[in-house]
């Protein structure tokens, strides 16, 4: 509100303040009467003007003041509208009737400072009170949380106690349930024992009455008495279901018939025995209806209860042993089956690898093939650039060619690691592959060529060489001479190029000889092993002697080193040629050397690529014999030349 009152001062109030100031009124009166204003001894004179102008000046000032008042009124109205829109209240004009003196101003300023200080103190007190309230609230919240935690802990303890009590009750119930059947079983067993004892005693009495007749001899009396004593001490325990009544009746009837036929005097005794047997039968039916009975279908003199018990024990032991043996037998069979499955899987994998012997080893990687084809494309572009005399494109294409060759030779090192391996060499031997010692795709200088004088001496000394070799050498010399004439080489350039050519050829020949010797030694080792009757399989290599293994590994490593050194030699020659010749001359050399090499003995790469794609494109995996045939065809130089000529004619 204070800020709004300060800027919403009406023009009437401003004009009243000006009128109250006597100094301003005096200046205005002077200006109206004399046309001059005195302000701190600064005189303003208007003597050169006419009297008419003096009269017109106050009217202009009044008009300006009126215009100023109108503008201020418009601004005032706009401010009132803004105020009403902001605060939604009508504007009240401030009252300036009271004149403020300097003393009042000096008194008001410290009052304002005190008010500000009081306000700050009030604000500080309010902030402190708020902080205290917040602290109290935090303390109350912490106390409530602690109380809640204590209540939760008490509830958890109560729950645990209840669970423990429930578990104890359950255990007691289980124990009672387990004890009840055991008690019942014990009672039943005791009752059974009592009944069996009673039955045994009664049966013994009946047997004695039955067998101890007047006609029985003394020995039988003694045997039966001894048996009865043994029977009393060692009571039988059998699980065989028997019927004592029927057996006893049958025995008694047989004995009675015999006694009636032999002696008529024994009738009374037999009748007594029958009566006793009938009484026993009735009592036994009542007491032993639920008990298993003893089988006495044969002579009691032959019974031996010890043998019966031993037989049962033997049966239980034999059954246990049989079950254990059965489990062991099943485990052995399962282990054998697992071993057989593992062996079958291994054999399947080995068969698959044998079917793909040549593909994985001799198949060149797609990256290397793509790089070689790109080099050929670059050479074709160089031919066009030479025809068009475009030096910029020549420089760019030569740069691309050098970069691609460096990448290509780095990939060939990886392929060398694949081939120079005893297992891979063994597989190639099984497949019947004969590798060519020279696998160079592009030879810049065309083989064995020294200076012209050395070539003439060699031709004179070696008269036994074939005519084809002479023709090849003449062709090599002729294309190189033609290149010198076409490129317009200087004497220095031709001399440097000849020296570099001689050095390259000598190094290349030495490396070729060493590689051929190492190849022959490796083949001798494998051929000697094959002729000795030793199976050439990957497993058989593990059974070699350590000396042979070391020899083979050393020779293979040397062969690898020689191949890599030949690759480095080619790279060095490329870099040295670029330093001797200009870009146009270098491009022309690459084009001529490429044409000469493609017409000559170097293998054609499209043929290789087509062969490998034909092998891989088959739906079924190719057999071992198909791969061997293809590799032999590739190794035969005659067939390769025929295919090259055929493609070249196309």
Swiss-Prot record:
Membership in a protein family: Belongs to the bZIP family.
Keyword Transcription regulation carried by entry: yes
Positions of region (Basic motif): 307-327
Annotated region (Disordered), positions in chain: 109-130, 242-279, 452-473
Domain of life per record: Eukaryota
Q: Name one GO cellular component term.
A: nucleus
Name of the protein described by the UniProt record: Probable basic-leucine zipper transcription factor K
Give start-end positions of Acidic residues composition bias: 118-129
Residues of the bZIP domain? 305-368
Task: Give the record's keywords alphabetically.
Answer: Coiled coil, DNA-binding, Nucleus, Transcription, Transcription regulation
Q: Which residues form a coiled coil?
A: 37-180, 259-286
| The protein's role, per its UniProt record | Probable transcriptional regulator.
